Amino acid sequence: MLKRTSFVSSLFISSAVLLSILLPSGQAHAQSASIEAKTVNSTKEWTISDIEVTYKPNAVLSLGAVEFQFPDGFHATTRDSVNGRTLKETQILNDGKTVRLPLTLDLLGASEFDLVMVRKTLPRAGTYTIKGDVVNGLGIGSFYAETQLVIDPR
């Protein structure tokens, strides 16, 4: 475990040094993280729809766990996927209201995490906040983002 931690630390430090050499200081500023959420089949309460959530850390450099947080009424399962790979039970926390992807790397804002929640019964009409963040890690930039998903009445 110590060897792996040492390797990850070395990789992080090497990336930071390389980045500081290659980029002029004016280009090294991170943008704010962004997140978007939309329903695919319907926006009406109590109907079934896929939900697509796209989170971009937009970091100059980040190394940590990407975390999606959902409000009451939304629950992730092992039928859902991130970037085309189905979620594992160990990635689904808090009764499906949190999805955590361990050890992710974003360099120069290149990473994008597309979470697809399959065939979800939409909750009652209202406005719901969905959040994305990089937690338990190191990095340069602001990683927190949230978006609103509006569910319409029937």
UniProtKB/Swiss-Prot annotation:
One Pfam family, short name: BslA
Highest taxon in the source lineage: Bacteria
Main subcellular location of this protein, as a coarse class: secreted
Protein location: Secreted
Keywords: Secreted, Signal
Signal peptide: 1-30
GO cellular component, as recorded: extracellular region
NCBIfam families in alphabetical order: hydrophobin_BslB
Record note on quaternary structure: Monomer in vitro.
Function: Has a minor role in biofilm architecture. May contribute to the surface hydrophobicity.
Assigned protein family: Belongs to the BslA/BslB family.
Protein known as: Probable biofilm-surface layer protein B
Species name: Bacillus subtilis (strain 168)
